[in-house]
Amino acid sequence: MDLGIRGRVALVTGAARSLGKADALALAAEGCRIAILDLNAEGAEETAKEIATGGGTARGYGCDIREGVDVGRVVTAVERDLGPVDICVNNAGFIYTVAQLKDMKDEDWALNLAVNLTGTYLITKAVFPGMRERRWGRIVVMASIAGLMGGFGQTAYATTKLGVIGFAKSVALEGARYNVTCNAIAPGIIAPNASLSPLFERMVKRVAMQREGQPEDVANAIAFLCSERAGYITGAVLPITGGMDLFTF
């Protein structure tokens, strides 16, 4: 199925590895020109090279999405190198340390907010005006099932993920009349995170399908939401959980 986005410029944050990399590869397969942003500049360049080796067009950029000046610098470079940004996938996120509220360190709370929420805001703010002016844009933010359900020991992480859902819905309202959509993805347990700790192993047992998801499960949904075929979908929250959010006996 042709998604109708060949030649579009797609910016993907946190795309040096894992889920973000899968997002970038899926969009590249649809013919998008890809800007790979990551705090790990070398990893971003490696992902870009992999796309180029497969016949696509991509550039890698080191970027700290917590810093507005750095975001502005990189977005300017992307538009110089590849063209105006049509698609923005806010994948970058902080892999939290599980801690109950009574034990949480203030710096962990601040880091969750800075990466998961402020970073999403800064990147989106940088590309949104151009999308609005050109009357076409697709924005996806990475939430989590934790943002919808909460989680024991996940106060900081879940708070930021619910926050980006509210952000996505508000941006969707602002962009609607300009053909700029904004949607949120709420993944459940996605490999390789499921292998990080015994906590994830226990959580997989709550999944109705009794298995973890793969990065491609999320990336394929994101590619669709970024396409011409999803032009009437905005302000939505799409759980990709294998039924983790369902009540099972």
What are these regions (language model features)?
Residues 2, 95-98, 149, 223, ...:
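Short C-terminal tail/terminal secondary-structure segment
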Residues 41-42, 62-74, 106, 216-217:
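The beta1-alpha1 cofactor-binding region of Rossmann-like NAD(H)/NADP(H)-dependent oxidoreductases
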Residues 99-101, 105-113, 203:
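Substrate-binding pocket helix/loop in short-chain dehydrogenase/reductase
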Residues 124, 160, 168:
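Active-site helix of classical SDR
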Residues 129, 173-174, 231:
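Alpha-helical segment proximal to the catalytic Tyr-Lys
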Residues 144:
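Residue(s) in the substrate-gating loop at a strand-loop-helix junction
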Residues 176, 181, 233-235:
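Short, small/polar-rich loop/turn modules that mediate ligand/substrate recognition or access, typified
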